[in-house]
């Protein structure tokens, strides 16, 4: 429990620190690349090996795919959206974990779980509601935030299985090496014609290098705590649900640091969303 709560306290700072970067592609590339370095240092510090068993490599691929979807959709969402509106949707991965279990594992859920799903969806919609602007004011951002949530569920499931046989640092080293290379290729191919490649991939380092490094360090520490929780026997959906205490925290950060508006209303709906996630797990 303490590991997950510690992770929840650290997690929102990653997106807060790189929100509003002039070159968000380079910022996210910088964060993922920093994880490779941190994982290598942790591996050396703990006197571990970077060699992985053959059976773990499909989980590396699954985790990297989920992370690619997650990071890309978070970047697209936060380019145009308030942190406190969309972060709660992005972090509602227990909803996707329960859905994947139902569709692919033939798991059936109690009425309590269905109530939790309803509360989660209501909270997610109402967080971004503005009176007079229409209920679904920015449906494209709802879509990218939801895709990020699904990506989070994919890598969470992959990582929880991997932690049954491997230590966090070597696993993260290879996952983030694959992810960083994938992002380098993707951002190179999608670079605007008028933007130099060096600016596309490294632009953030000239304007906010400390923000990128701090974001990488805090997010790495946050997720290593989650992997330790998986190693200790934590069930992925339960761990993800407890981590949802970061949702109201993100709303407060958005108001205090980014000066986002309507914080009390959004905080109320964020609490409803988090309550719905808790009910999903309680009834699963």
Where are these regions (language model features)?
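Alpha-helical transmembrane segments of compact multi-pass small-molecule transporters, enriched
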Residues: 34-39, 89-103, 178-182, 222, ...
């Amino acid at each position: 429990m303490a590991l997950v709560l510690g992770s929840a306290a650290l997690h929102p700072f990653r997106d807060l620190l790189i929100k509003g970067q002039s070159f968000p592609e380079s910022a996210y590339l910088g964060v993922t690349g920093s994880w490779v370095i941190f994982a290598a240092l942790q591996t050396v510090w703990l006197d571990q090996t970077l060699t992985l068993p053959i059976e773990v490599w499909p989980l590396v691929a699954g985790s990297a795919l989920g992370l690619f979807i997650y990071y890309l959709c978070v970047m697209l969402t936060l380019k145009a959206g308030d942190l406190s509106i969309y972060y709660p949707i992005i972090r509602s991965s227990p909803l996707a974990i329960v859905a994947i279990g139902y569709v692919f594992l033939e798991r059936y859920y109690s009425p309590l779980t269905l109530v939790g799903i309803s509360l989660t969806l209501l909270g997610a919609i109402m967080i971004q509601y503005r009176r007079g602007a229409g209920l679904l004011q920015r449906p494209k951002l709802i879509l990218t935030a939801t895709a990020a949530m699904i990506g989070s569920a994919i890598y969470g499931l992959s990582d929880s299985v991997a932690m049954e046989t491997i230590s966090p640092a070597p696993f993260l080293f290879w996952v983030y090496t694959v992810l960083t290379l994938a992002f380098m290729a993707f951002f190179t191919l999608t670079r605007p014609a008028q933007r130099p490649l060096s600016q596309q991939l490294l632009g953030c380092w000239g304007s906010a290098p400390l923000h990128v490094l701090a974001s990488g360090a805090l997010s790495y520490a946050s997720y290593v705590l989650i992997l330790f929780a998986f190693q200790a026997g934590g069930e992925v959906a339960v761990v993800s649900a407890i981590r949802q205490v970061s949702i109201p925290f993100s709303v407060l950060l958005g108001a205090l640091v980014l000066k986002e508006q309507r914080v009390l209303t959004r905080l109320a709906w964020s609490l409803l969303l988090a309550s719905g996630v808790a009910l999903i797990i309680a009834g699963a």
